[in-house]
Amino acid sequence: MARKALIVKAQRPQKYKVRAYNRCKICGRPRAYMRKFGMCRICFREHALRGLIPGVTKSSW
């Protein structure tokens, strides 16, 4: 989990709009963010394996 202070800091409006960055909506992680799903790769993997994301399946061949 990300530090609460950093999550709150990211939510505040920035002085310059280019400073704004995305964070995972579940854990608050700023890196490896997947814009289409709004979460980081770790949370995406956990949710996909549990079947919580519609249309996403684990590939096998």
Swiss-Prot record:
One BP annotation, GO: translation
Pfam families (alphabetical): Ribosomal_S14
Comment on bound cofactor: Binds 1 zinc ion per subunit.
InterPro entries assigned to the protein according to its UniProt record, in alphabetical order: Ribosomal_uS14, Ribosomal_uS14_bact, Ribosomal_uS14_CS, Ribosomal_uS14_sf
Self-association state and partner proteins as the record states: Part of the 30S ribosomal subunit. Contacts proteins S3 and S10.
Family to which this protein belongs: Belongs to the universal ribosomal protein uS14 family. Zinc-binding uS14 subfamily.
The protein's name: Small ribosomal subunit protein uS14
Gene symbol of the encoding locus: rpsZ
